[in-house]
Design a protein with these regions (language model features):
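Residue-level detector of flexible, active-site-proximal loop/helix-junction positions
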Residues: 18, 59, 78
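Catalytic donor nucleotide-activated moiety binding site of glycosyltransferases and closely related
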Residues: 1-20, 144-152
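Conserved beta-strand scaffold positions in the cores of enzyme catalytic domains, especially
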Residues: 11-13, 52, 71-72, 113
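Residues at the C-termini of beta-strands that transition into short coil/loop
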Residues: 15, 56, 75
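A structural signal for well-ordered alpha-helical segments within the folded catalytic domains
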Residues: 22, 39, 43, 121-128
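Leloir-type glycosyltransferase catalytic cores
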Residues: 68-211
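A donor-sugar binding/catalytic signature common to diverse glycosyltransferases
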Residues: 24-71
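Intrinsically disordered, low-complexity boundary segments flanking structured domains
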Residues: 2-3, 62, 98-102
Length: 211
């Protein structure tokens, strides 16, 4: 891992230490939750039974969240051909694209897309929903719709149905997890706000890349 210049009383870099795995496991064990990306180390949070808040995920169907108390936000996908940000509904309807994203075999150039990171407001909003989460609260109707889209996509996708066991398939289908309410309001379906965001991003990309 390359070094980076960051100093804080709450930040400790143990990556160069001899017992870095031991330090990592201790940290997972003593932490209240995991906050980071959906890279492989996010799986350790599940092993230690810790809640997870994952940002900038591109695994729209299975973003390493398994319980209702786990939260995820996704990268935005700007389609260069259509000059817009794709809604989650549109991503799931494009089975090939969603599968390439899930398997991390995506090529932005060949797919004519640009992946855009979550901005500060999206991450802050996700953290707020994550910290205020309660099992007793009424569930979000949009979250139900997201999970139904995800399940429908998995059921019609050969990548999942060709797995060796029924248990494996059922595990993916029945995974639960939460997506921030405001994120779903903005990105689950095409709407006027998403059109405004698309126009703004398209304008910035045009200045930067002359698309």
């Amino acid at each position: 891992m390359s070094e980076f210049d960051f100093k804080s009383s709450n930040f400790f870099d143990f990556t160069k230490k001899e017992k870095h795995f031991e330090y990592l496991n201790r940290q997972y064990f003593s932490s209240e939750f995991y906050f980071g990306t959906g890279a492989s180390h996010a799986s350790a949070a599940n092993f230690f039974n810790k809640r997870s808040l994952i940002t900038n995920s591109i695994c729209y169907s299975l973003p390493r969240i398994y319980l209702k108390g786990d939260f995820v936000t996704f990268k935005k996908i700007f389609c260069l051909k259509e000059k817009k940000v794709l809604s989650l509904e549109e991503i799931f309807n494009r089975v090939s694209l969603a599968t390439k994203l899930h398997t991390h075999s995506i090529s932005e150039k060949s797919e004519s897309i640009i992946l855009i990171d979550n901005d500060e407001d999206e991450i802050l909003d996700a953290a707020r929903d994550f910290l205020n989460f309660s099992e007793q609260k009424d569930e979000n109707e949009l979250l139900h719709k997201y999970h139904q889209m995800r399940k429908d996509y998995i059921l019609k996708n050969k990548f999942f149905s060709n797995k060796d066991t029924v248990d494996f398939h059922e595990f993916f289908i029945n995974c639960e997890g939460s997506v921030p309410k405001n994120f779903l309001k903005t990105y689950l379906f095409q709407n006027e706000l998403l059109k405004e965001i698309s126009n703004k991003i398209g304008f910035e990309l045009k200045k930067k890349y002359l698309i």
